[in-house]
Amino acid sequence: TWIKVQDYLGQLLAGGEHALLMLDPIPWFEANIPNNAGLYHVEHGDNGLIYIGESSNIKERYDTHSGTTYFSALRRHIGTDVLEFELHVRNGKKRYFAESEDKEINKYLHNCKIKAMKVNFGRFELEEYLIRKYRPLLNRKENK
């Protein structure tokens, strides 16, 4: 059985890609994200697909991305790469934006849509496959 699964890897990844792409994108702040392990895909009106991520709990990750910047790589990349803000040091960590800049990141997210799907097995592989294939603007894992 294990050998058969390995033989079908390409088909499994293509199936996961198809399932994600078939989902309707939901405006960022209107999304009702499932409380499960899974994968999410973020697109922006002007920039198209900007980020693909995975999490053991995509609802919690979505909430993190919707809050302030400290724990959110997506928010940091929007701030530095798109809006060209500088990260500030606080408590010895360079992971903060000014409050006004965090508000600008929220404005950017208002122009984003998200797709999220439950993935119990293979989410790391599917995330890596999709990042390599689509090279989203804000992902850093393209060097995997």
How would you name each of these model-derived features?
Residues 63-68, 80-84, 132-136:
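Short, intrinsically disordered, mixed-charge
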